[in-house]
């Protein structure tokens, strides 16, 4: 023990006098270095503008002394002066009127004349108000008595002095973890005392502070070794496991779990009890000023954090206690070979209390406030200790996870356990264990069995810690696709709804995924884009255009296809009879005619080309397409059976029957083929007929055969053969409509062939005779429609036609007279539908009354020029009719002005026509007419009326 410790009163007086001399200069120097003023515990209010701090004292007699204001926030506490009092000179006497005078509870001995010598310090009883007492408790809630700890440490230090070995170790540790500063040893020699007076107060404070820290660490090291030896003596096997909670009997000291370096991860070390620095109390004043410690009050969030960390460490400690003996032996050898750390690392919750007590010790031992350099050195030492704690904790966590990873905390294991678990029928009425709140009833839905709120699910966030294993990742996780929905920040829309917006105070409001705040000040973005990109506040969802959604879905599909494992597919082997488009199929060989230029076509190719050309055939392109058709027909020159010519005539005939409206155009096509066909074409089966005659033979034979069959046989019938009345829009309905269209198209096509003189009058006479035969015996509606269609087509021309049969001559008009006689009988007697009956009446009127001048005569295919000419004619007719009507109206109005309108009585309900005021204004004023009317009546109906009628 040093002389300074043996004579605390003398040491305190020396320190006090030195503090009084150096305090003003040190304060001025330190504040000039900082460059700002310290108000209320070092808060920076006005930088570079010192108030009452750059002077050795307050010129206005401020009562707070030459130091800072309020001295760490304690207004009237004597302990805040740190063992020294301000000098009582004239400048420190409070002036009334400038500051509020607080009561002075004692008269310090410095209140003497300024020039008098200082007297010996005499302890004076302090009359300060009793501050609020804060009770310090342990983790278990028991009361912590700091005085008893202080006494116990004093007794332990008296029994045994500190060995030099820990001091050397402490010195090495302090050199490695803190700033390298030599620690001066206090001496009792007068020469050293005189040299200490010359040293600045800041340097003395720094050295004293470092010395006390080293003494405290040495005491902790000694106590830890004693506890290790005691625990190893009681338990024959040294404890090499993780730290356990060791409690001393008869003491209520808080327990502190110690965290060692990675080399000592599994060593069993007793917890360090919270100490009170007795060494500092011995070197400070002894009973002059009694200090009341005011520990720091923790906030609610800090307490929750401390409790959570405490639980986690307790769980880790319990898990480490259950380790096997071989692991203990390995850790024992590792610990024996590893060096013992010089300082103990404590839990985070007890570090706060230790810091508070170290602040109390500093205030009790140091006569002045530690400078910035002292605080920095202490912070460096604390950071070094925290670094050691973090390293040991990380290594301990890694070891623990490696040892406890036995496959029970994987996703696959949890899923297997859930399969065997009994499901909960009603999650809202189920009794959950203590500490777990059930789900809120407002999330209950009738059509969904299990619904939970976020509050219920967040309870299991820290309790269920599992990691993904390879089996689960391969089977399930690889198939999970997170859509970009939500957002372009690589997060879903729902992920930012709960926890990511707390800093903005929105709680559960979803912010714009597309950074709306950054875009709000942009003037270059268009209004349309800003509407798309901003949030929809009603739905809390960002607007996405349809194109973006389609792109996103397309990208998702591509991503899913990429993620799917590619299946091995056998290469495609094309079959011999596979379907190939005609334009892709290439001929291996081309058949050429003997001339070497003309290409010979098969029957299928002829039909395909004819269908294509007939679909393109119009009156505007008639010449070009008909020339191509004629070229195909001329291929029959190199044939002996006329196969190509038959195919051409067949396709034209089918197309003409299927499209009755274009029958005249197809008849013109047949006429061009007959006229321009190569006369060298022959057919072995039809001798004597070549070229055009062969075409007419094919055409007449095809029309005659189809006309004899009729089109009634193509109509759908019942099983017994009776006609079927198909339902609307059914397959039978379309089949019947197609058969009717083709039958009437055939009759119309035959009629246009006759009008182009491709069929003779004799052929047409045979057609009418066949129809008249069918009309005599209960004719069908199909036969009557065919007769009406043929008469509309060839009636006018057949009326004047005649032909010879042997020596007799037959007139067409005579045949038509007998035909219309049969039709009159059918109209009067036969039971036919009204539609057919009116058609027969119309065709009868067309012959007898209109002389075959029908309005529908020109209803056929027309060119674009013909359509325009027809529209122009109709427009001119309409204009002429309007001009005629205007002329008629003008003439009638001219006569109406000459009439005298009868006066309309009020009781009469007859409305009279009012004429324009414009004409009445221009007209000259009426002349007086004689009362007696003349015999000439101005009213055209006056001859039918009497005089009494006019008067009325």
Swiss-Prot record:
Residue ranges, annotated region (Interaction with PAB1): 188-299
Compositionally biased residues, Basic and acidic residues: 140-151, 218-228, 246-276, 283-294, 309-333, 504-521, 532-569
Keyword Thylakoid on entry: no
Residue numbers spanned by region Disordered: 1-77, 115-389, 481-575, 870-952
Residues with the Phosphoserine modification: 163, 195, 503, 883, 892, 896, 908, 948
Claim: Cytoplasm is one of the keywords in the record: yes
Compositional bias segments (type: Polar residues): 7-16, 47-56, 154-166, 229-244, 355-368, 908-922
Residues the record lists as Phosphothreonine modifications: 181, 888
Lineage top rank: taxon: Eukaryota
InterPro entries named in the record: ARM-type_fold, eIF4G1_eIF4E-bd, eIF4G_eIF4E-bd_sf, MIF4G-like_typ-3
Name listed for the protein in its UniProt record: Eukaryotic initiation factor 4F subunit p150
Record organism: Saccharomyces cerevisiae (strain ATCC 204508 / S288c)
